[in-house]
Amino acid sequence: MELLEMNCPYCCSPETRVHCTYQTQNYGPRRLYECTACFEYFSETKHTLLEDLKTPLSVVWNVLNARTEGMGLNATVRTFGVAKNTVLDWEQRCADLQPVLFLYSLVHQFLQVVIEGDEAYTKIAKNVPPDQSTGWTLLLIDRASRFIWTLECGKKDRKLFEQAIQTLEQIIQDSEDLTLLTDGERRYGNLLFEICHQLIRTGKPGRPSKTLKKGVKVRIKNKGSQAHHKGPKRSKYQAPWKEHPHTEQAVDVKEIHANHAEAFFSALRRKCATFRRRTNTYAKSTKGLQRLLDVYWVIHNFIRIHFTTQEVPAVSLGVIDRRLSVPELFQIHRA
């Protein structure tokens, strides 16, 4: 597996050889490598989560697993008898793997991708109106494999949606057919239309029409009553943005929903302490929430088996061949 290859951390060369072994207190013997390209020496834990880590790996994993199963930060500190800053350091080490694994996932090619988009809200720092809160979390999840592409938090504005659409743009470049399904939120499609469009030149006079790129489809399900809306009512299922004439339009009405994304957020409110309702908000921050979301992203996609597919989401999507073990995850080089 390419993720686990031993490359030089200085020049990224794969031409390395074992120089010697040395003994550690908690992890047994380890290897010291020599790069035959730049002649630098480095340990097998260089630039990994295990670098300068003296605590046994089982303790670190139990703490991270508890944090992604609903235990709060202070409760974790009391239960496992470790310092708060130590727990935060372990979380940050694991969160640093998110950009590495995300880029590794993007280099793969996909024939057909169906992505659901949804948002969830939690209070940050203090209780403010939802439109002013920075606790909105935006999710893009693959329907078939349950692989999470985007899990970003912040204020519900154009900047947050642009981050998700930039991810979609990269997926579009690596897939032949992409369908985006949302529950009434039109900003996904608006920004996607701005970024991923093309001009249809027919040779007729006038300005060429602008459409989504070939193979890209966006569908919206308008939920709830529209009795209080003035003017014409929107249909329940819509394709509000013009699509390429050669794009296959076969999307069943029954398939236009974001139920899997909503179910994910229902589970997240149990598995992530910052999303649990009726909790104190004095200890929450956007930075801390994003750090924990990145940890959850790594464990959900590459470690934890999903109960529906009975596979790790990354395996179901075809990103990796098998589930990563915890020691293997901790040996991946950080960004």
Q: Where are these predicted regions, by residue range?
A:
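Residue-level recognition of single "structural anchor" positions
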Residues: 1-335
